[in-house]
């Protein structure tokens, strides 16, 4: 990948990423209890928690917002999520299906003062792109030729793979989002689940 993007080792399996752009940005926060590991990752890079200025959330699933409240308090960073998913993060709406059970088992402390993404989708030099389907307000990000895919897709054995249907809010809407994102210019795909890999024209195999 590029020298200014890092997959955080402590979140392997459901990756959070650091972006060294105009400001330092964290994409997603992992499961409950992974926040301390993320702080240790920062320390290993000679960084202080307060160096992180923004936390961008791809979607409301517990394995992506589980350490959000902890890291908000530790870093003082500004929190961003989609207006569609913010009510789920605050607990004002229940997650559907199996996700409701998961959120009941994995109790998550609620963050405060979440900002919805700007209409133009710009956070500094990062572009937020609406890609609903996995959740109603799922968002991907593009920075410097890298797509931060969240759970729009996953990777497995060096290939792009679809998300499991039973985990998606709406499969047909997700398919539309795959078509949409394939029209954007990027070289690398950084998923939450699976390892980063080069695009190499594989997206069309998913829709």
For each of these PLM feature ranges, what is it?
Residues 25-27, 56, 79, 146-148, ...:
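Residue-level marker for buried hydrophobic side chains located in beta-strands
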Residues 25-54, 99-113:
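Pre-active-site segment of Zn-dependent metallo-hydrolases
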Residues 35-81, 118, 188:
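Active-site metal-binding motif and surrounding structural segment of the metallo-beta-lactamase
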Residues 1-45, 140-152:
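Conserved beta-strand hairpin/beta-sheet module of binuclear metal-dependent hydrolase folds
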Residues 32-33, 85-130, 136-201, 206:
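Metallo-beta-lactamase
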Residues 76-83, 150-151, 167:
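Short hydrophobic/aromatic-enriched beta-strand-loop microsegments
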């Amino acid at each position: 990948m590029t020298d200014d993007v890092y997959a955080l080792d402590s979140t392997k399996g459901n990756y959070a990423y650091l972006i060294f752009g105009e400001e330092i940005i964290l994409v997603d926060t992992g499961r409950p209890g992974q926040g301390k590991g993320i702080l240790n990752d920062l320390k290993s890079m000679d960084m202080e928690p307060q160096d992180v200025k923004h936390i961008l959330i791809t979607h409301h699933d517990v394995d992506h917002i589980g350490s959000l409240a902890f890291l908000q308090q530790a870093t003082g960073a500004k929190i961003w999520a989609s207006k569609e998913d913010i009510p789920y993060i605050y607990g004002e709406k229940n997650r559907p299906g199996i996700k409701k059970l998961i959120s009941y088992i994995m109790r998550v402390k609620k963050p405060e003062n979440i900002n919805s993404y700007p209409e133009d989708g710009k956070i500094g030099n990062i572009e937020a792109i609406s890609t609903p389907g996995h959740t109603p307000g799922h968002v991907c990000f593009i920075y410097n030729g890298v797509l931060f895919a969240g759970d729009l897709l996953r990777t497995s054995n060096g290939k792009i793979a679809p998300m499991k249907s039973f985990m998606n809010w709406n499969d047909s809407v997700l398919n539309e989002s795959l078509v949409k994102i394939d029209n954007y210019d990027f070289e690398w795909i950084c998923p939450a689940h699976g390892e980063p890999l080069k695009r190499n024209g594989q997206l069309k195999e998913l829709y």
